[in-house]
A protein has these predicted regions:
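Conserved, structured core segments of small domains
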Residues: 1-94
Length: 94
C-alpha cells in the first residue's frame, strides 16, 4: 500500500462549511471502515483539514474525495501528496 496526505482547503465561509460538516464526517467514516483513512482532523486555525490515508494508487484517493460532500458542494479544494515513509514508530510496523 502507498501512503498519502491530503490537505483539504476551505473555499467558503465557515458558516457554509459548518452546514455540510456532519455529512463530510459521515463520508470520511466510510474511508475508515474500508481501511483507507488512518487519521483526519481540522487544521488549527480551522482553514481546512488534513487526512492521512493508505491506498493502492493516487487515482483511488482522488476517486474517494470526488464524492466527499464538501467537494460535491463546491466548498473545498484538495492537495494530494504521496509519500514513502522511511521511519516510523514501532507500533506502525504493519
Amino acid at each position: 500500500m502507498k501512503q498519502f496526505i491530503i490537505e483539504i482547503i476551505y473555499q467558503a465561509e465557515p458558516e457554509e462549511i459548518a452546514k455540510v460538516r456532519d455529512e463530510h464526517r459521515k463520508y470520511l467514516q466510510t474511508g475508515y471502515e474500508k481501511g483507507l483513512i488512518l487519521m483526519s482532523g481540522p487544521q488549527v486555525p480551522q482553514i481546512g483539514g488534513l487526512v492521512v490515508m493508505k491506498g493502492n494508487s493516487m487515482e483511488e484517493i482522488h476517486d474517494f474525495f470526488a464524492n466527499d460532500p464538501y467537494n460535491l458542494a463546491g466548498l473545498t479544494k484538495y492537495l494530494y501528496f504521496e509519500f514513502e515513509p522511511v521511519m516510523h514508530q514501532e507500533f506502525m510496523k504493519n
